Every structure is written in C-alpha cells, then in structure tokens.
Amino acid sequence: MTEKKITVGIIQQQNTGDIADNKKRLKHHIEQCAAKGAQLVVLQELHNSLYFCQTESTDNFDLAESIPGESTEFYSRIAGELHIVLVTSLFERRAAGLYHNTAVVFDTDGSIAGKYRKMHIPDDPAYYEKFYFTPGDLGFTPIKTSIGTLGVLVCWDQWYPEAARLMALQGADMLIYPTAIGWESSDTPQEQKRQQDAWIISQRGHAVANGLPVVAAVSYTHLRAHETCADL
C-alpha cells in the first residue's frame, strides 16, 4: 500500500444479551463510519453477543452459526450497500462438535473475501475459550481485498509475534485484530495499567517489527458504544 491512504473505522460496542438489538446498533455504527469516509471497518471480537466465554456452559453453543449463514448474509448486505471492506468476528459452527472463533472479511461488493479461524485459544479465568473453540486450520494467510491485503488475526493471537510475522512475510499490508480483552474485576488500578501497557507495547512491537499499521477493535464490557475513524 505504498503511498496509499486508507480511512479505517473501528467499532467498539457495549453489547447486551439481545443479539438482534446488538446487530441493529452495529449496523448503525457501521453506517456512521462509512458516512465519515471509512473504506475499511473493523468490528470487535464476537460482536454479535456478550462475551460468553467468561463461563463454561453448553447453552452458549446455541449462539454458534454456520458460515455462510444468517450473520454473513446480514453483514454482506451492509458491506455491499456501503461499498466498504468489513471485518467481522463470528462463533462458527463448522460441524457437529466442531466450533471455531472465526473472522470473516467482506469486500466492497458484499462477497466474502476470506476468513481466518483463531489459532491461539486462551484458557484463563473468565477466558474459557478452549471449552468452546477448536484451534483454526487455515494457517496464517492474508486476505486479498479491493483496498489491500489484510493480515487478519484474532485477539489472543496478538501475544504471539510469529503470527504477525507470518502474515507480513506473505504480503499483508496491515495487521488487524478483532479483540475482546480486559482484566479481572478484582485487579487493582496498578495491575490494570500494567496489563494495558503490556498490551499496547505488544501491538506497537508488531507494527515496528513488521513495518505495518496495526488495527485493533477492542471489546470492554464497561465501555460505551462508539465508533472512530483514522487514516492509515
């Protein structure tokens, strides 16, 4: 993307248990980003619902859906109508007993440009993702779109420099991370700052080491919904 400027919209929305309302509000924020000139819009990790991995419950598998499916049709229409590239994050039901945390990228015509299945799966207090997700099998392959080649990864992948490096070596023009990350409610302000600083430093490290812009849409449950645009 030498000498090419792209305006990126990042949406970080506070969700509720009402998936239909969450998607309605996401659509509004996506439209607002497009109205501000965004050519690329990135949503947070697992943006259709609350971050359900804080507990281990078989009921949560009802949130999963096939790809393609209802959500891909919904976001495909939005991307096509607004002529934007849209990065989404879905709970994929691939087959009986096989589920993934999957990023799906839509091109400006609404077509699916590609997808990435999260490779690094955490298993920590309040992040019980191994209960739900099988590690991805698509490798670290950048996704080609009409605005550039996107190195799309998901959340916990951002703590591993190899993932970013492999994307860069294969021609990614930027690194993108739909993310859901925070801290324990019992953490002190000092511990919260330590974790936040470590996360920011890691993202800067990916940018510096690979010479690429890094885009992260972060879901914090205590944040108010907002969208922002920036030029890269």
PLM regions: where:
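Short beta-strand-to-loop element that shapes/binds the nucleotide-sugar donor at the catalytic cleft/hinge
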Residues: F91-E92
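Active-site beta-strand/loop signature of hydrolases that rely on acidic residues for catalysis
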Residues: V8, N22, I30-D59, A79, ...
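Short beta-strand scaffold segments in enzyme catalytic cores
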Residues: T102-V105, T141, A230
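A short, polar/charged loop-to-alpha-helix boundary motif
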Residues: K118-Y132
